[in-house]
Amino acid sequence: MARRLWILSLLAVTLTVALAAPSQKSKRSVTVEQPSTSTNSDGNTTPSKNVTLSQGGSTTDGDEDYSGGDYDVLITDTDGGNHQQPQEKTDEHKGEHTKENEKTQ
């Protein structure tokens, strides 16, 4: 009887530890290096920024975890500040693509 109690308590401790451990997700990211300046259609020259695309994964710095199929864009300024901008399609953006697709058909 004591042996069964010992085995059950060992099993309970093992399950508790296994469930309490944080799950590890893989994090994928790609950094896109861009030229130092870019010129738009008006001829204006603007400094470019490095863009990092990342998907899923857990973070160790306390930032939110944007898991899922959409990519997040991390823009690194020249001053070293990071600004995370989730990519979201607006209704207006979707409407433009629908109109373009109708024109091509």
Curated annotation (Swiss-Prot):
Predominant location category: virion
Signal peptide: 1-20
Biased composition (Polar residues): 29-55
InterPro entries membership: Cytomegalo_UL22A
Glycosylation: residue positions: N50
Pfam families according to UniProt: Cytomega_UL20A
Alphabetic keyword roster: Glycoprotein, Signal, Virion
Region of interest called Disordered, as start-end residue ranges on this chain: 21-105
Skewed-composition ranges (Basic and acidic residues): 86-105
Subcellular location: Virion
One cellular-component annotation, GO: virion component
Coiled-coil regions listed in the entry: none
Family, similarity comment: Belongs to the HHV-5 UL22A protein family.
Protein name: Glycoprotein UL22A
Organism per entry: Human cytomegalovirus (strain Merlin)
Classification lineage: Viruses, Duplodnaviria, Heunggongvirae, Peploviricota, Herviviricetes
